[in-house]
């Protein structure tokens, strides 16, 4: 936020750099036609004098749910459409539920155009050009985030369909074998594309290092996606996709969509400005 950035001084940046940029908390990744011996020599040549150990350990507090029944509305006057998003808490990347959550999300909206939410809003109702989601499972916590732009005059109906599809995923309409098979194929085929270039390989390695996971996870990823059972995927969906745990965020023309959102009865409507500050 501007109010926060404005208080940061040059001395603050220097202190942060000195405290956090430490060799013991860093990784140097080489990908290409280079041997370990050559890479080690290069690292010593350019970073051999870098000393200082590791950065101070710190603990990030677990995320606290905002509570059910929250709908945040950001007013953008004369907006051509409304962007709808929701966020649901999810487990960290190291969780044994990782594959099941990933596949449940792929059925919901994270697996391309043939997913439930996208088929509903794009193909069936024509309210949107596309709605997608992503299961972002990080080191200490995760989230399932879905978003998409919809017609302004169909904002209320679209928001209702977001919640309906979450309810369906959480158990009202369990995931089927064909849906799970399609989700597996999408994720496994997409995973292979993450190794199409040297840069992409480096990104995968750095990502695992940042998550505190062993490099063997590069091999285990497709195996875990293949091994997750239908029962496990439906259990993960029931646990993490319940609409009561979702926080809705809408960005659009308040004058055209607020009344409908309040009639939706999805929860308290909280007005925010474009910087995320509450509007009275």
Residue ranges and their predicted role:
Residues 8-10:
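Peptidyl-prolyl cis-trans isomerase
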Residues 39, 117, 158, 236, ...:
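Hydrophobic side chains in well-ordered alpha-helices
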Residues 51-56, 114, 192-196:
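Secretory-pathway/luminal and periplasmic proteins that interact with or process carbohydrate-rich
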Residues 1-3, 23-31, 81-92, 101, ...:
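M16 family metallopeptidases and their MPP-like homologs
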């Amino acid at each position: 936020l501007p109010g926060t950035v404005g208080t940061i001084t040059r001395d603050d940046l220097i202190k942060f750099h000195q405290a956090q940029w430490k060799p013991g908390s860093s990784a140097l990744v080489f990908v290409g036609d280079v041997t370990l011996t050559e890479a080690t020599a290069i690292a010593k040549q350019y970073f051999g004098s870098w000393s200082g150990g590791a950065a101070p350990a710190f603990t990030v507090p677990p995320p606290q749910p905002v509570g059910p029944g929250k709908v945040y509305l950001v007013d953008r006057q004369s907006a051509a459409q409304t962007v709808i998003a929701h966020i649901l808490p999810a487990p960290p990347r190291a969780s044994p539920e990782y594959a099941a959550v990933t596949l449940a999300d792929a059925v919901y909206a994270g697996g391309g155009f043939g997913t439930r939410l996208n088929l509903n809003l794009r193909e069936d109702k024509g309210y949107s050009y596309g709605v997608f989601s992503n299961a972002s499972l990080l080191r200490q916590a995760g989230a399932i985030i879905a978003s998409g732009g919809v017609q302004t005059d169909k904002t209320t109906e679209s928001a209702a369909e977001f919640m309906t599809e979450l309810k369906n995923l959480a158990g009202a309409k369990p995931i089927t074998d064909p849906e799970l098979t399609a989700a597996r194929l999408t994720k496994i085929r997409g995973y292979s594309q993450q190794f199409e270039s040297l840069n992409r390989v480096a990104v995968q390695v750095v990502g695992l290092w940042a998550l505190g996971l062993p490099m063997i996870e590069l091999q285990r990823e497709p195996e875990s996606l293949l091994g997750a059972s239908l029962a496990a995927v439906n259990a993960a969906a029931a646990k993490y996709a319940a609409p009561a745990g979702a926080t809705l965020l809408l960005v659009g023309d308040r004058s055209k969509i607020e009344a409908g959102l309040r009639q939706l009865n999805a929860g308290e409507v909280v007005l925010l400005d474009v910087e995320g500050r509450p509007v009275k």
